[in-house]
UniProtKB/Swiss-Prot annotation:
Residues 1-24 form the signal peptide. It holds the Pfam family Cyclase. Disruption phenotype: No visible phenotype under normal growth conditions, but the double mutants cyclase1 and cyclase2 are embryonic lethal. The keyword Signal applies. It is found in: Secreted, Extracellular space, Extracellular matrix. The lineage of its organism: Eukaryota, Viridiplantae, Streptophyta, Embryophyta, Tracheophyta. One of its GO terms (cellular component) is endoplasmic reticulum. Keywords: Extracellular matrix, Secreted, Signal. Transmembrane segments: none annotated. One of its GO terms (molecular function) is arylformamidase activity. The gene is CYCLASE2. It comes from Arabidopsis thaliana. This is Cyclase-like protein 2. May function redundantly with CYCLASE1 for normal plant growth, development and viability.
Length: 272
């Protein structure tokens, strides 16, 4: 039976809408330009925020950035650091945020240029840090809760030779200092003699700690100078170490490639 030309033409014209309908239901919530601007979602949207992934195999040991997170020598936290510079609600084609934060805020990394001006001028920035040091087997240890990390404390930890990455969990975690917006000078950190003992007597090249500085407030610059003098030790600060057992893990830390910056936010995870 011959198909009337008009019927054939109408069938061809209807194919695009049929394809769009199939695509919307099978592959995408909507095809751009064919659905309302809300995307056509009917279910209530609730983002899932995790600390642990893979049934306890992956631990996120980085802190979330919020206006209330502590900032160096501030009683008010970092404050507003993120804003929506372009908004779809105001007619923009997409949402685009901008941010402004100190590079040594939250979970972050120090480069040698942080305390050595000659290294800063020479270009020893976070882009020059060795990712091989920032990724690999790491030991999470608990530090005695009542003191800063001195040479005596380092000796008492009995960290074996050959261990190159150590995360030091201190009283800072128990006190939840990284969850308090007011900067606290009584945090636990390395004294100069503890830093020197580590450099002289261990193979540690990655030093991680659970507040904004690896160095105790009373030995702030001297301890940093010891750690960063040889440009081989990398400092990761502001780690979130609650809820993780002491022991051996695979650590993975990735700073931003900020050319010219002596510090950078860093995302760190532990894999069991």
């Amino acid at each position: 039976m011959a198909v009337p030309p008009l019927f054939f033409l109408l069938t061809l014209l209807s194919l695009p809408s049929l394809l769009i309908s199939a695509g919307a239901s099978n592959a995408y919530p909507s095809i751009p330009g064919t659905a309302p601007i809300d995307g056509g979602f009917t279910d209530e949207l609730k983002p899932i925020r995790r600390e642990v992934y893979g049934n306890g195999k992956i631990y996120d040991i980085s802190h979330r950035y919020t206006p209330e997170m502590p900032s160096w020598d501030s009683s008010e936290g970092i404050g507003r650091f993120l804003w929506l510079a372009a908004s779809m609600k105001n007619g923009s084609l997409a949402n685009n945020s901008e941010m402004k934060i100190p590079t040594h805020t939250g979970t972050h990394v120090d480069s040698p240029g942080h305390v050595y001006d000659k290294y800063y001028d020479a270009g020893f920035d976070v882009d020059s840090l060795d990712l091989q040091v920032l990724n690999g087997l790491a030991l999470l240890v608990d530090v005695p809760k009542d003191k800063n990390i001195t040479a005596e404390v380092m000796k008492s930890l009995h960290i074996p030779k050959g261990v190159s990455r150590v995360l030091f969990r201190t009283l800072n975690t128990d006190r939840r200092l990284m969850f308090k917006k007011e900067f606290d000078t009584s945090y636990v950190g390395f004294m100069k003699d503890g830093a020197q003992w580590l450099v002289d007597n261990t193979d540690i090249k990655l030093v991680g700690i659970d507040y904004l500085s690896v160095a105790a407030y009373d030995d702030l610059i001297p301890s940093h100078l010891v750690f960063l003098k040889d440009r081989e030790t990398i400092l990761v600060e502001g780690l979130k170490l609650d809820g993780v057992k002491a022991g051996l893990y695979s650590v993975h830390c990735l700073p931003l490639r900020l050319v010219g910056a002596e510090g950078s936010p860093i995302r760190c995870i532990l894999i069991d």
